[in-house]
């Protein structure tokens, strides 16, 4: 047996001990008390750790409303920060959603902002995210913190530079206070790894919290954060947004700075690029984030941004929305069909929205190429990272078949690019010919599924392949009436049938969130967010 | 000896006859009369083909001023179109600058626009390029016209679709009337090919018209067009702009729609992408073009655009300009040094511009990689195209060594990408640390050189590699005082010395234009154009 400089188990044990030490004793909950519960959403307010003001701050506002309160001086930045640190600590103890905890640094910065504010009352006016605690997926670098991405070989190597976005968010006035869990390889639908373990879904702990930005999903669902940032190369913002019943925006590539995010791909891998975006409890918070970022000089922070500015576009008063009921390879499960129907019917009742049924072409071929784009040189680089500390692949890496992807050649790579250029033309034409403002469709063929069963990203990956922005809007939750139906309803062959069988009815899936995604034109993120806010206002009666 | 379906010579002969037939008899000049002259700039107004109004229309305005006259109804669109068709015909007979001639279609469209205008006087208000004749590099597809790019194998295959930009320009009100010459392979500094032959430089016919957009360069220098469109992957807009003493803008990749431009690269080749941009007799015409394009919905025309809108940015009143005197591998020739000094001194006299001397890092390594990016799979695809009709490579293809580029692997390609990402960070830092708005530097180490001697693009290619926008501003012309100096002044070794020796003094180089290029931040095309217009107003006393 090979000898490792250090075995992953001891690295993980030490890392977990250190992480635990970052939670003040007074904030510890009796986790055993909640061991039997599957739905943990109420625990933060019932566990007795938060005082009345902290419950108020963390429970009753979205980031937009909270920002207003901070500007009005209702609460100091320190009060707000402490409240969210506490609630994040509770969320973590319930779901294992955090990787790096730096509450002390955050509270110290909050105090400084409060001091500055006393000396110059105008200083906050200029900073659109002033005083707002923002959580980040572990892959973003924050000075002094590890960026292990759950790989043992990267533990205890604190960053000496911020990711471009972390630097920008600080300049915009935000408070960074924690980073969140993700899958080994950052490629699966289960936020599980050998260093930090698995993040649980607070709606139903028997189900996955989703991935790869699953830590954010669980943290935000429990309101341990109101605004977090994920990345999405095949669905990694949208899948956990669906699983955890929150809003999420996959921005177009480069619109939100992405440089300095740890990416496990071979350096220089191009083709389909990961994109960053916000996850939140309201869609207007996603807008707050996107507007703040797109109004700033992102190009000074990151040499790889796409400089699409926020334009304060007029909101359209009449919308045409393409409706895609299924993607032609994976049949949506009964709750997903019900959720999409519900959203469609609500939109149809509006005089301002016209629904246009659509079919998406070439999904199977596109998804095959997307999977190859994920690892054009094969997956040896992952094995090499695992082998440094002897860690095994997590189960969900096997579920998606990642380690069996073989590399292609330069010619094969360009052939994929050429096919993608053709697909891009076809899809633009589909949008233009139908004069649609957006497409509405499922985020996946199913809700959150039991652990380690999330097998593909055919509903989400298409939009990464084409680089169209996409927004997840929660619609409902699985309830008593969502019965399983017969597998004969699976229309697309044996693999589809296997996936379809996963849904066994409301007993196992109780409270699993149901969502839709809304997709807009490439780089038209602002227009899409406007459209999605309009749709959300009808579906969920918000803003 | 191999038998070809058809030999390139017969294809070229037939194509040239057809082209010649597109010029009305009344517009033919006695070309022999000008066989001895090297400077042809005055011939269009002295040859007797243009009447007084046509001379006025084509000689005394830039496109911006002419557009105003058209809107005022001083001249009909037909009058303007006929005048430019005539003058383009003259320019072509002098320099062989045109490939496809479609004057009839253009004049027919002009009549239609005039008719529409009579019926609805407001129709022109909405179209920013209303009634303006615009010429296109041959590689842009125009319905009904060949897109041979000077390759015999592509002759007699008329396009059934417009390039995205051609479609957009028509929708913006422009008149398309001709396409222009370029080098075989679209990769050299000499616009020469086996189908159409060589374009001459109207300033000095002993020198190259530059490439690859050399036909536009010659045509615009002779005012056979006021506004043309080129493409630039290593300098192909800027080199002919320098050689022909005109303005040219290499936009950032994707800002000006580029889809449907014939690209001889293997389909799907990515890495360094070609960018389109305007060439004109004034910089404000380049702005007119860029503003019109960037204000339109380019993303509806082209699935590959980068949606950076025109923002009507405030023009900065104080500028910091980085001055790069040479690029560290090729020593500028005496006229280039004089031109840059002249521009620098003029700018320094302004209270509003601060000059910051700069050195550019890593040019040699960057240029090596750029050259590999031009043909990552090697150059067999060119040979294959040549072989279809038995045509040989043109001399300038040998000069640049294109056919000896060997392919790389997918891993090698990603390694190049990774080096480029690092270079991009370094260069952004150079710009930001020095707080510069732009860099000013030579366009090449030399002016236009004798035929088939243009050997590299080390001054221009850098900005394609990094995707920074760049503007060419003419500064002066070679005159009596521009003596050659000793080769000891060549600082960078034998290859530099060979290049340096090319400049033999004002006898051979008489009237060769001298220019500078001004480079701005990636995708900040609008801000760069503002900066360049300001610099131009000081250097050339224009707007």
Where in this protein do the model-derived segments appear?
Chain A
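Short glycine/serine-rich loop/turn segments
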Residues: 126-276, 324-326, 376, 439-456, ...
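N-terminal, positively charged, Ser/Thr/Ala/Gly-biased leader segments
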Residues: 74, 91-154
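Acyltransferase
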Residues: 77-81, 111, 332-359, 383-393, ...
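Acidic-enriched catalytic cores of C-N bond-cleaving enzymes acting on peptides and small amides
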Residues: 1-49, 268, 281-307, 311-313, ...
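An N-terminal boundary/leader segment
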Residues: 1-115, 325, 345, 349-352, ...
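Structural helix-boundary/capping segments
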Residues: 90, 167, 171, 221-324, ...
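Short helix-loop capping/hinge segments that flank enzyme active sites or metal/cofactor-binding pockets
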Residues: 44-50, 54, 129-152, 312-324, ...
């Amino acid at each position: 047996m090979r000898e490792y400089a250090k075995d992953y188990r001891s690295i993980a044990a030490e890392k977990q001990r250190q992480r635990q030490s970052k939670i003040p004793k007074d904030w510890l909950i009796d986790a055993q008390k909640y061991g039997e519960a599957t739905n943990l959403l109420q625990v933060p307010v019932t566990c007795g750790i938060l005082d009345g003001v902290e419950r108020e701050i963390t429970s009753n506002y979205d980031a937009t409303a909270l920002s207003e309160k901070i500007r009005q001086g209702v609460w100091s930045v320190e009060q707000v920060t402490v409240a969210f640190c506490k609630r994040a600590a509770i969320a973590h103890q319930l779901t294992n959603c955090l990787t790096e905890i730096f509450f002390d640094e955050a509270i110290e910065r909050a105090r400084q902002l409060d001091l500055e504010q006393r000396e110059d009352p105008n200083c906050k006016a200029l900073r659109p995210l002033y005083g707002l605690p923002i959580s980040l997926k572990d892959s973003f670098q924050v000075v002094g913190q590890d960026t292990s991405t759950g790989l043992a070989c990267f533990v205890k190597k604190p960053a000496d530079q911020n990711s471009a976005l972390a630097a920008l968010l600080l300049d915009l006035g935000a408070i960074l206070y924690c980073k969140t869990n993700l899958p080994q390889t950052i490629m699966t639908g289960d936020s599980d790894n050998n260093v930090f373990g698995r993040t649980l879904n607070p709606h139903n702990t028997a189900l996955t919290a989703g991935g790869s930005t699953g830590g954010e999903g669980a943290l935000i669902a429990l309101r341990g954060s109101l605004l977090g940032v994920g990345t999405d190369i095949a669905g990694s913002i949208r899948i956990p947004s669906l699983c955890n019943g929150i809003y999420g925006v996959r921005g177009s590539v480069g619109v939100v700075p992405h440089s300095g995010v740890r990416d496990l791909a071979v350096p220089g891998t191009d083709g389909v690029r990961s994109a960053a975006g916000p996850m939140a409890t309201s869609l207007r918070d996603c807008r707050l984030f996107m507007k703040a970022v797109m109004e700033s000089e992102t190009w000074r922070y990151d040499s790889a941004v796409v400089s699409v500015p926020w334009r304060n576009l007029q909101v359209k008063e009449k919308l045409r929305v393409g409706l895609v009921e299924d993607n032609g390879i994976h049949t949506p499960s009964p709750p997903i069909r019900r959720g999409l129907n519900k959203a469609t019917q609500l939109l149809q009742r509006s005089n301002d929205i016209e629904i246009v049924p659509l079919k998406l072409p070439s999904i199977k071929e596109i998804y095959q190429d997307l999977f190859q784009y994920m690892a054009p040189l094969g997956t040896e680089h992952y094995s090499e990272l695992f082998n440094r500390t002897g860690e095994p692949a997590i189960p969900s890496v096997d579920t998606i078949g990642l380690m069996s992807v073989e590399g292609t050649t330069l010619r094969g790579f360009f052939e994929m690019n050429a096919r993608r250029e053709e697909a891009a033309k076809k899809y633009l034409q589909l949008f233009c010919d139908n004069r649609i403002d957006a497409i509405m469709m499922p985020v996946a063929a199913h809700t959150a599924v039991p652990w380690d069963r999330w097998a593909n990203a055919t509903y989400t990956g298409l939009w990464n392949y084409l680089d169209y922005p996409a927004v997840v809007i929660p619609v409902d939750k699985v309830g008593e009436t969502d019965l399983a139906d017969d597998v004969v309803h699976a229309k697309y062959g044996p693999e589809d049938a296997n996936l379809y069988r996963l849904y066994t009815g409301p007993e196992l899936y109780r409270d699993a969130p149901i969502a839709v995604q809304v997709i807009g034109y490439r780089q038209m993120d602002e227009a899409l967010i406007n459209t999605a806010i309009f749709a959300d206002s009808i579906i969920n009666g918000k803003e």
